[in-house]
Regions:
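Juxtamembrane C-cap of transmembrane helices in multi-pass membrane transport proteins
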Residues: 12-29, 41, 78-87, 95, ...
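Transmembrane alpha-helical segments that form core, pore/gating elements
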Residues: 13, 43-46, 103-104, 109, ...
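Specific alpha-helical transmembrane segments that line the substrate/conduction pathway
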Residues: 33-35, 39-43, 81-113, 153, ...
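C-terminal-most transmembrane helix of multi-pass membrane proteins
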Residues: 39, 206, 242-288
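Hydrophobic transmembrane alpha-helices of multi-pass small-molecule transport proteins
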Residues: 46, 50, 67, 73, ...
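Specific transmembrane alpha-helical segments of multi-pass solute transporters/efflux pumps
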Residues: 51-91, 96, 131, 214-232
Length: 288
């Protein structure tokens, strides 16, 4: 991995870490409404950029692939935003960032070569996730619901990156991002309508937050991750947000006075160790 890609991934990690803080800061806006405007705004920005600097078109096969990728990305954001509203920042970010575990599982089903140590890391990460959930033993617990959909959001993100790996090999990142975010916004719009949320349920003062979400965590965050997936594996790319729990939880404590849950405090390092092992040995397998 080059220094340039490393710096891009660092910027992406810092950028995506701002999402959970914004969701908490505009608590009056429904989670699904926030998710929609984040995707729609990001798409609009990239389409506007394309007018200034045309970047090409999608091939017929990639048009089909991007529809699926956009649907899964939309489901990811819908689940992640709802997760933040229904559990702690620490739990939501920890469980929402274990996508590398799912990319490994997908690789197994694709019959790709997997290093044995990757399985060890997978087991460790799963155990860590269990520890994070351990404080929410009641099936009626709001935290259990939030934790579960945050975990589901990680699965959707993993599928998105697996699809992105194929699309990005022959598609410019701006072309991919503008279409991906647009399909994702339509997906969230459908989910919001099904849930009875109106995308117009916000105040004029919330618009700057929508623009922030579209620019910082979306374009400087996820869109840069989409750029990197052309050069490194989906597992490596999906591991970048692992820094988010540390950053977001710290800001959650400082800005909202939210104590880091004991389960997340204890299980968080276990999850990170497990995913680190996955990434390290996934890279070894890729080189082989």
């Amino acid at each position: 991995m080059t220094v340039r890609i490393g710096l891009i991934l660092l910027l992406a990690m810092v950028s995506v870490s701002s999402t959970s803080l914004v969701v908490r800061s505009v608590a009056t806006v429904p989670a699904l409404v926030l998710a929609f405007w984040r995707m729609f705004t990001a798409s609009g920005m990239l389409w506007s950029y394309s007018v200034i600097r045309p970047a090409g078109k999608l091939s017929p096969i990639n048009k089909k692939r991007i529809i699926f990728a956009g649907i899964f990305l939309g489901c990811h954001f819908a689940c992640f935003f709802l997760g933040i509203r229904n559990t702690s920042i620490a739990n939501a970010t920890l469980l929402g960032c274990v996508a590398p575990i799912f990319t490994v599982i997908i690789s197994i089903f694709q019959k790709k070569k997997i290093n044995k140590m990757t399985y060890v890391g997978l087991i460790i990460a799963i155990v860590g996730g269990g520890i994070v959930q351990s404080g929410d033993i009641s099936l009626n617990s709001a935290n259990l619901f939030g934790n579960s959909i945050a975990l589901l959001s990680a699965l959707f993100l993993a599928i998105t990156f697996v699809l992105a790996e194929e699309i990005r090999q022959e598609t410019a990142n701006v072309v991919y991002g503008r279409s991906l975010f647009f399909v994702a916004s339509i997906t969230v719009l459908f989910i919001a309508a099904t849930a009875g949320d109106s995308i117009l349920n916000f105040k004029p003062g919330d618009i700057p937050w929508f623009l922030f979400l579209g620019l910082v965590p979306s374009i400087f965050g996820h869109n840069l991750l989409n750029y990197a997936v052309k050069y490194i594996t989906p597992t490596a790319v999906s591991s970048v947000p692992l820094g988010e729990p540390i950053i977001a939880s710290l800001f959650g404590l400082l800005l909202f006075g939210e104590a880091i849950p004991f389960g997340a405090l204890l299980g968080g390092p276990v999850v990170l160790i497990g995913v680190y092992i996955i990434i390290k040995h996934q890279a070894v397998s890729a080189d082989d």
